[in-house]
């Protein structure tokens, strides 16, 4: 049902100023407004908006109350009591769920996955490196074998580094954690 500002104020038992404030807060307008044009509202859309807004306000109040209770109760908990252990378990479950959600949304990945991916890429790089000496020898037949052998030795070193990547990652991860923590 289309209603004007006055009718909407009567529906909610609020003042016209309150309706204007709600409009500034994002209450949906059907049409109108501007100089001399009456603003019209869809009462169903406004009621839906009001209910959602009211629920958000109430949820925020409850969140704050729960947070205050948690902070107060954390300081009151005594290690070894069942309440303390229950609180620790709840916190651990919440942390685990947050980590699972982060993993499901690909915000974090497991170290084993990183090791797998990097090892796979390193293997592909190693196979490309392996073909370089032969390609250079074909492209530049005037090169002496000692030059090609020198190139092979350095490429073998790089291939060995790439092949050992899966063994290096856990150590590098520990080093990273130490430096960033």
From Swiss-Prot:
Hey, which family's this protein in? Answer: To phage lambda DNA packaging protein NU1.
InterPro entries found in the cross-reference section: DNA-bd_dom_put_sf, Phage_lambda_Nu1_terminase-ssu, WH-like_DNA-bd_sf
Give the superkingdom in one word. Bacteria
Q: Which gene encodes it?
A: nohD
Native organism is: Escherichia coli (strain K12)
**Name of this chain's protein:** DNA-packaging protein NU1 homolog
The miscellaneous remark of the record is: Encoded by the cryptic lambdoid prophage DLP12.
């Amino acid at each position: 049902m289309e209603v004007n500002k006055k009718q909407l104020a009567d529906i909610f038992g609020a003042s016209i100023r309150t309706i204007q404030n709600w409009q500034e807060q994002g209450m949906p307008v059907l049409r109108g407004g501007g100089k001399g044009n009456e603003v019209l509202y869809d009462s169903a859309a406004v009621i839906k908006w009001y209910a959602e807004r009211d629920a958000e306000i109430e949820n925020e109040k409850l969140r704050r109350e729960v947070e205050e209770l948690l902070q107060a109760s954390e300081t009151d908990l005594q290690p070894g009591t069942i309440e303390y252990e229950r609180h620790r378990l709840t916190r651990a479950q919440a942390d685990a769920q947050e980590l699972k959600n982060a993993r499901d949304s690909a915000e974090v990945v497991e170290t084993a996955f990183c090791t797998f991916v990097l090892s796979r890429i390193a293997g592909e790089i190693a196979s490309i490196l392996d073909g370089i000496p032969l390609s250079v020898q074909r492209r530049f037949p005037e090169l002496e074998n000692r030059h090609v052998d020198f190139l092979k030795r350095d490429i073998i070193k790089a291939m060995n580094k790439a092949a050992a990547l899966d063994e290096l990652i856990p150590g590098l991860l520990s080093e990273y954690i130490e430096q960033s923590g």
